[in-house]
């Protein structure tokens, strides 16, 4: 059964969504992310993906208080990403209730530090974030495209012991146009043992079914929930 991971993206302490990572497209869905998280939990959700969008741009963790509030008021297993660039940022994330962290930019910009953290905290807690646009990895809140190609990037890090990968197709993110099933199939063909978390484009229940059929282990989704394209009741079939 595919693992369901709703996303809460945070700007100014509020639950928002963007389209293709463009901060000019932000739409506020709830002023109180804790309420959103509690509602997820009440419907049987166990996992949560929190993105500190302020942190991603500021290049240091900003919305750790929201993380702390959600972690202390729910039993959700949280992975947290956005702005984790230093040891201090990482400690802040874990101290405020994240059980896992998603690291993208640091894996590109500072591989030595990423590998140190992987060794220190283990591959259950460290998720490699691979945010892809036209087969290249993007960093710093998707504002900068690196020259790293997706498959070689994943090869390098699986050799280092990475097991969990959150792969977002930026062109699909927040667009409600369906996920890149072929992309995820390609990744799983290359790395059959990877715990791949698909992200970007989920628009309806059928999209989640398609990912499950493709044997994708987990999926992150947000906008479809917030826009009412998927209801929390719809998700019962996957519980």
UniProtKB/Swiss-Prot annotation:
It catalyses: 1-(5-phospho-beta-D-ribosyl)-5-[(5-phospho-beta-D-ribosylamino)methylideneamino]imidazole-4-carboxamide = 5-[(5-phospho-1-deoxy-D-ribulos-1-ylimino)methylamino]-1-(5-phospho-beta-D-ribosyl)imidazole-4-carboxamide. GO terms for biological process: L-histidine biosynthetic process; L-tryptophan biosynthetic process. Keywords: Amino-acid biosynthesis, Cytoplasm, Histidine biosynthesis, Isomerase. Pfam families: His_biosynth (PF00977). One of its GO terms (cellular component) is cytoplasm. Its EC number is 5.3.1.16. Pathway: Amino-acid biosynthesis; L-histidine biosynthesis; L-histidine from 5-phospho-alpha-D-ribose 1-diphosphate: step 4/9. It is an enzyme of class 5 (isomerase). InterPro entries: Aldolase_TIM, His_biosynth, HisA_bact_arch, Isoase_HisA-like, Isoase_HisA-like_bact, RibuloseP-bd_barrel. It comes from the Bacteria. It is found in: Cytoplasm. The active site is at 9 (proton acceptor), 131 (proton donor). One of its GO terms (molecular function) is 1-(5-phosphoribosyl)-5-[(5-phosphoribosylamino)methylideneamino]imidazole-4-carboxamide isomerase activity. PANTHER family: 1-(5-PHOSPHORIBOSYL)-5-[(5-PHOSPHORIBOSYLAMINO)METHYLIDENEAMINO] IMIDAZOLE-4-CARBOXAMIDE ISOMERASE (PTHR43090:SF2). Belongs to the HisA/HisF family. This is 1-(5-phosphoribosyl)-5-[(5-phosphoribosylamino)methylideneamino] imidazole-4-carboxamide isomerase. It comes from Phocaeicola vulgatus (strain ATCC 8482 / DSM 1447 / JCM 5826 / CCUG 4940 / NBRC 14291 / NCTC 11154) (Bacteroides vulgatus).
